[in-house]
Amino acid sequence: MSDINIKIGLAEMLKGGVIMDVVNAEQAEIAQQAGAVAVMALERVPADIRKDGGIARMSDPKLIKEIMSVVSIPVMAKARIGHFVEAQILESLGVDFIDESEVLTPADELNHIDKDSFKVPFVCGCTNLGEALRRIGEGAALIRTKGEAGTGNIVEAVRQLRQVNKDINYIKNADKSELMAIAKNLQAPYDLVTYVHKNGKLPVPNFSAGGVATPADAALMMQLGAESVFVGSGIFKSA
């Protein structure tokens, strides 16, 4: 049902830019005018989700449609981890990317969405290479760090990106005979570990998110190897 290469190609088009969290159509227009490569449609930014507590779900379809109607750049929206019906709703709305997001309250603590069964590309978060490769194995077309969304604190995003890069470098320089053991240790698909060994990078774009609060933070992540950054509530909330 899906062609992963087409999905990855769509994700590649977002490289070298900023993806901005927006909570209404006006913010979406401002983000587009300011040069954002995409917007993330949200009812509440992560900082407010943290502050308010309670259950965080997919955004109201009405809000997503309003945002889609005023911008020409890609529109992303978040679904809860494992909530494939929220993802089906988002796909039917015509969003350009779905972020299966840990910022929302998980619907399934054991299983992620089977992303290959959708035509729309998925974004997924990771804290290390094993997690990244498992999500790619499920059909993710774009990987990002999880960081600490809504805090304005960049430290976790930096740690995670450095860890992914370190793990990639280790696999790239490993002997071919070690790859099966590495795959088992990472709990990752063997073919994806082999890809990393041969190419020295993930098979999908590698972005950064979670606590990116200033232009300097965004530049830091890019210079550490992130191919784009998700700039969220941190940029408004950071003191």
Swiss-Prot record:
GO terms classed as biological process: amino acid metabolic process; pyridoxal phosphate biosynthetic process; pyridoxine biosynthetic process
EC top class named in words: lyase
UniProt keyword Lyase, yes or no: yes
Catalyses which reaction(s): aldehydo-D-ribose 5-phosphate + D-glyceraldehyde 3-phosphate + L-glutamine = pyridoxal 5'-phosphate + L-glutamate + phosphate + 3 H2O + H(+)
Entry GO MF terms: pyridoxal 5'-phosphate synthase (glutamine hydrolysing) activity
Entry-linked SUPFAM superfamilies: Ribulose-phoshate binding barrel
Keywords in alphabetical order: Lyase, Pyridoxal phosphate, Schiff base
Active site: K78
Residues that coordinate or bind D-glyceraldehyde 3-phosphate: R162
Lyase found in the keyword field: yes
One Pfam family recorded for the sequence: SOR_SNZ
Disulfide bond sites: none
Record-listed E.C. numbers: 4.3.3.6
Function noted in UniProt: Catalyzes the formation of pyridoxal 5'-phosphate from ribose 5-phosphate (RBP), glyceraldehyde 3-phosphate (G3P) and ammonia. The ammonia is provided by the PdxT subunit. Can also use ribulose 5-phosphate and dihydroxyacetone phosphate as substrates, resulting from enzyme-catalyzed isomerization of RBP and G3P, respectively.
Name of protein: Pyridoxal 5'-phosphate synthase subunit PdxS
